[in-house]
C-alpha cells in the first residue's frame, strides 16, 4: 500500500458508533476525533465496534476529522 504524503497516522480506540458509518475515536494522545471508514474497509465488510483498537489517518488541515484505515484483530 502506498504511503500518502502529509497524512498523520495515529492509533486510537473507538468510543462510540454514530450514524452513517461515522465513529468517535479517542486517540492515544487523548484527543477525540470524528472518523469514517475507508473505502477498502467498506468493500471488504470489515465491521467496527466500540472499544476496537484502530489506526486513524488525519489530514494536517483538519485535525478533528479522520479516516479509519485499520482495525486491530
From Swiss-Prot:
InterPro entries: NA-bd_OB-fold, RNA-binding_domain_S1_IF1, TIF_IF1. It is found in: Cytoplasm. Residues 1-73 form the S1-like domain. It comes from the Bacteria. GO terms for cellular component: cytosol. It holds the Pfam family eIF-1a. Keywords: Cytoplasm, Initiation factor, Protein biosynthesis, RNA-binding, rRNA-binding. The keyword Cytoplasm applies. One of its GO terms (molecular function) is translation initiation factor activity. The keyword Cytoplasm applies. NCBIfam families: infA (TIGR00008). One of the essential components for the initiation of protein synthesis. Stabilizes the binding of IF-2 and IF-3 on the 30S subunit to which N-formylmethionyl-tRNA(fMet) subsequently binds. Helps modulate mRNA selection, yielding the 30S pre-initiation complex (PIC). Upon addition of the 50S ribosomal subunit IF-1, IF-2 and IF-3 are released leaving the mature 70S translation initiation complex. Belongs to the IF-1 family. Component of the 30S ribosomal translation pre-initiation complex which assembles on the 30S ribosome in the order IF-2 and IF-3, IF-1 and N-formylmethionyl-tRNA(fMet); mRNA recruitment can occur at any time during PIC assembly. This is Translation initiation factor IF-1.
